[in-house]
Amino acid sequence: MSNIIKAIEDAQLKQDLPKFSPGDTVIVQVKVKEGERERLQAFEGVVIAIRNRGLHSAFTVRKISNGEGVERTFQTHSPIVNSIEVKRRGAVRRAKLYYLRERSGKSARIKEKLAKK
């Protein structure tokens, strides 16, 4: 029985996702339906958490909008998520960056990860 469920879930996984980790700045293109039309809306921010659960994987992105912190959680393999683009790689030493919620300004900055030679 579990083999059937696994086969169905594997068929629904997205294959074209970039590798990203907490601390990375990403641009998530989200499909938004307004009345009859459907358009793409970009949500750019820092990945503060990733939850790896196969088809049920999710990640949380945080950005500052008009001086107010905004967090949005996306299902990684959802059809609503059109694309994910990694804008910059961040060097962090934690898996969950919830401490960024209490910080603002310069203390909330994340160092950029240097490329390996």
Curated annotation (Swiss-Prot):
Q: Does the keyword Signal apply?
A: no
Q: Which GO terms describe its biological process?
A: translation
User: Cross-referenced InterPro entries, in alphabetical order?
Assistant: Ribosomal_bL19, Ribosomal_bL19_CS, Ribosomal_bL19_sf, Translation_prot_SH3-like_sf
Q: Has UniProt tagged this entry with the keyword Cell membrane?
A: no
For this chain, one GO molecular function annotation is:
structural constituent of ribosome
Function recorded in the entry:
This protein is located at the 30S-50S ribosomal subunit interface and may play a role in the structure and function of the aminoacyl-tRNA binding site.
Looking up PANTHER family in the UniProt record yields: LARGE RIBOSOMAL SUBUNIT PROTEIN BL19M, RIBOSOMAL PROTEIN L19
What's the protein here called? Large ribosomal subunit protein bL19
Q: Which organism is it from?
A: Aliivibrio salmonicida (strain LFI1238) (Vibrio salmonicida (strain LFI1238))
